Amino acid sequence: MQVMVEGKEMVVTPGLQAHAQKQAQKITKLSKHVLAVRLFLETIKKKSNDPTANQVTYEIDIPGNDVVVRAHAADMYEAIVKATDAARRKLRKLAEKQRDLNREEGLAAS
């Protein structure tokens, strides 16, 4: 499983890279089916304390689906944490949906 962190119109510092990698590992622990995780960090040129100045986009490759999650925050570290939480919720929801479908198929077959 590979994790890629890229900056759009910004330089990704080693501290930011380490934080993003650590957060992405939380996603990979959630599901064994995650093939790849791409993190795009972007700073939007606006006012200094704009709550949407920093955007983080997760692209998560899983069999059958690609999950895309975005989050905004005034601080890049906070945006990474928000995006990670949103991605974890979305993956849990997909896993639960798949379990329900498998359960229904098992009941219908018997």
PLM feature segments, named:
Residues 1-110:
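N-terminal, polar/charged subdomain of small-to-medium soluble alpha/beta proteins
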